[in-house]
């Protein structure tokens, strides 16, 4: 993104070691959660944003944007704060997704 002569490629605002010992990185600028192999550095998958590999199910807003605080919780679901500045109308919310990494689906379980 270009703002007053500055290029903002990545705004990483959370990183977490996932249950399989890989990394979950939240990149706010591109609206993406990126799962990275902790050993090789290879991208395993991308959820959200322009390179999205997932289908969002039961989510009337079809995903998140400008997210913060991405976490994998004990039941295996992913929670995050959806800043929502790209939604119409703009709507911030806390969400929980049930993620099937094999099928590449992300089902909205809770939205507050």
Task: Put a short name on every predicted segment.
Residues 1-112:
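Histidine-/acidic-rich catalytic cores in large beta-rich domains
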């Amino acid at each position: 993104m270009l703002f007053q002569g500055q290029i903002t490629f990545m705004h990483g605002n959370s990183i977490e070691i996932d249950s399989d010992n890989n990394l979950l990185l939240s990149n706010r600028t591109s609206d993406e959660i990126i799962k990275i192999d902790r050993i090789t550095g290879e991208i395993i998958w991308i959820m959200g944003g322009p390179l999205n590999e997932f289908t969002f199910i039961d989510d009337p807003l079809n995903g998140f944007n400008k997210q913060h605080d991405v976490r994998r919780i004990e039941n295996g679901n992913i929670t995050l704060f959806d800043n929502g500045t790209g939604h119409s109308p703009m709507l911030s919310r806390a969400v929980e997704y049930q993620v099937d990494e094999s099928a590449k689906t992300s089902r909205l379980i809770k939205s507050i």
